[in-house]
From Swiss-Prot:
MF-aspect GO terms: translation elongation factor activity
Cross-referenced SMART domains: EFP, Elong-fact-P_C
InterPro entries reported for this sequence: Elong-fact-P_C, NA-bd_OB-fold, Rib_uL2_dom2, Transl_elong_fac_P/YeiP, Transl_elong_KOW-like, Transl_elong_P/YeiP_cen, Transl_elongation_fac_P, Translation_prot_SH3-like_sf
Subcellular location, principal: cytoplasm
Any Gene Ontology CC annotation: cytoplasm
Name of the featured protein: Elongation factor P
Keyword Protein biosynthesis applies: yes
Family the entry assigns: Belongs to the elongation factor P family.
Domain of life: Bacteria
Location of the protein in the cell: Cytoplasm
Record lineage: Bacteria, Pseudomonadati, Pseudomonadota, Alphaproteobacteria, Rhodospirillales
Pathway: Protein biosynthesis; polypeptide chain elongation
Sorted UniProt keywords: Cytoplasm, Elongation factor, Protein biosynthesis
Pfam families per UniProt: EFP (PF01132), EFP_N (PF08207), Elong-fact-P_C (PF09285)
Length: 187
């Protein structure tokens, strides 16, 4: 299925140069001069090799048709991350490198969809947002309120995110799983 490059999301499976690739990370780059483009970090489904590609936002790419399975994340162990198919109750593991940075967002009992090609799992699609707790936040420096200023915050999963100055350690926030950015304070 053809789609525009600006619709690429982590976890999707693309066909590029005759190979199947899982999207690990995306970044929209808007240079001062010229059109915007998408930088995509991908992993080859078969060999595990990684590559980086750049596409203009209007370019079209081929997204592979995959079978999506509704699953529940169970736990992490030496073999990788273990999921359970919600229909058949079968359990299977995926290696940490297959998930990339998405692994940091997994929480026990989280509902996810797993993409399978020819019966083998290749990627995980997370919810677009997760609620995480801020465990460490820098203090606000007085006088920095003239413009919107953000400060670095450390989340319970070990990831860092830029948060507004009113967020303190212990606060639960909503974080985007697409680009690891602060959305709002959790209600």
């Amino acid at each position: 299925m053809k789609m525009q490059a600006n619709q690429i999301r982590p976890g999707q499976v693309l066909e590029h140069q005759g190979k199947r690739w899982t999207v690990l990370k995306i970044q929209l780059i808007q240079p001062g001069k010229g059109g915007a483009f998408i930088a995509v970090e991908m992993r080859d489904v078969d060999s595990g090799n990684k590559t980086n590609e750049r596409w203009r936002t209007a370019d079209t790419v081929e997204r592979l048709e995959v079978r999506e399975i509704d699953c529940q994340y169970l736990f992490k162990d030496d073999t990788g991350y273990t999921f359970m198919d919600k229909e058949t109750f079968e359990q299977f593991s995926m290696a940490a490198d297959a998930l990339g940075e998405q692994a940091g967002f997994l929480q026990e009992s989280m509902e996810v969809t797993v993409d399978c090609i020819e019966g083998s799992p290749v990627s995980v699609n997370l919810p677009s947002q997760v609620i995480l707790q801020v465990v460490e936040a820098d203090a606000v420096v007085k006088g920095q309120t003239a413009s919107s200023s953000y400060k670095p915050g450390l989340l319970e999963n070990g990831m860092k995110v830029m948060i507004p100055p009113f967020i303190e350690a212990g606060t639960r926030i909503v974080v985007s799983t697409v680009d690891c950015s602060y959305i709002e304070r959790a209600k």
